[in-house]
Amino acid sequence: MKPLIALVGRPNVGKSTLFNRILRQKSAIVDPTPGVTRDRHISPGEWQGKQFLLMDTGGYAPENDTLSKAMLEQTMRAIEDADAVIFIVDARSGLTYLDLDIAKILQKTFKDKKIFFVANKVDNPQVALEAQSLVKSGFTEPYLISARDGAGVADMLEDVLNSLPCPEGEEIEEDDSIKLAVLGRPNVGKSSLVNALLGTERHIVSDVPGTTRDAIDSVLKRNGEEYVLIDTAGLRKRTKIDAGIEFYSSLRTARAIERCDVALVLLDARLGLESQDMKIIHMAIERKKGVLILVNKWDLVEKDSKTSKAFTDNLQNQLGNIGYIPVIFTSALTKKNCYRAIDTAAEIALNRRQKISTSNLNRFLQETLTMRHPATKSGKELKIKYMTQIDSDHPVFAFFCNDPELLENNFRRFLEKRLRESFDFAGIPITMRFLRK
């Protein structure tokens, strides 16, 4: 499993800026307003060949400059699950009571954790000089960085990663079993589905949302194939009371997605697709995992012969450009379509791993170009000479052409649709790269 690095600190010390700097992206909203990071961000990263998960714990401005119960809980959960912690303070404003509160938690409760003390916003020599006084936090001399400009970040991150055990050799998933993450909001029936498949009450199941707290692995053997079912706590809507649980569930979901081949995303048939469901789906797609939507509790819906088609059509419309995800209607209670879901997930997993010969791909390309020529742009025509598949853990295709700038989005979508139809990539994200040749 990839090591998890948590960014911890009071609001507005630059956690999101450092998060974006390390991942070289602008995925989090960065704003001077304290607590502007609305959701917990957990993303995969890579530095000098070493892979890891990076977590921005976010936070909001507590009242009276003391740690609120919710913020304390989410910070504690972040540290508890992390392999290393980057504790960030603002070098320009110096240590506050809140910084010292967090420092005490780290030193007393998590003294065995790998903790790296970082002074951010060190963007001139005077601030660097004043930052030396931060040792009164109880830690050794801090790393001096500027997340905004990148100064000092590389050296700090290198030390963090060198302190962590190499994940190679520790992975228990290096086998041929198909790994399925059972995902969804609380109370959609995740544990009930796993119980239905295993024929055992392995999990505690109740009507109280969020009964299952951690990811639990189960092994299912079916038709000579072995499946690892990763059952997780669901994603919650954000409330102050549930902030800690919501964060923890989000983390468990992200780590389960990292491990899986296919994400089984359960919806409540009575509620349909909600924003939290879309969040889970996008997390899986961003990580290039296979996705299968299970509309659970279908037995509780009043229906006729047209209900399932109407539901599917509406769902595909909501999904938009990711409407390639298959949909199966299930009932964990009656076991309706539960094993069909496993069989479909197996097909997705196998197709996600398939390697297509270059000759077959170029035969496909010629047939596709005969059906539709790329549109001209500024009087020039895109000419795709040949294509090939790049070795990866998901389908990646390279198209060699005269000028990638001539590619229109409409033609890209047409090519992707043709690829899906020709090679059965339903439920599988595809990466297409257009290279000059």
Curated annotation (Swiss-Prot):
Molecular function terms, GO-annotated: GTP binding
Range of residues in the leader sequence: none
A GO biological process held by the record: ribosome biogenesis
Residues at which GTP 2 binds: 184-191, 231-235, 296-299
Gene3D superfamilies the record matches: 3.30.300.20, P-loop containing nucleotide triphosphate hydrolases
Keywords tagged on the record: GTP-binding, Nucleotide-binding, Repeat, Ribosome biogenesis
Pfam families in the record: KH_dom-like (PF14714), MMR_HSR1 (PF01926)
Annotated EngA-type G domain residues: 3-168, 178-353
Family annotation (InterPro entries): G_ENGA, GTP-bd, GTPase_Der, KH_dom-like, KH_dom-like_a/b, P-loop_NTPase, Small_GTP-bd
Superkingdom of the organism of origin: Bacteria
PANTHER family from the UniProt entry: GTPASE DER
Subunit structure: Associates with the 50S ribosomal subunit.
Protein family: Belongs to the TRAFAC class TrmE-Era-EngA-EngB-Septin-like GTPase superfamily. EngA (Der) GTPase family.
Name the UniProt record assigns to this protein: GTPase Der
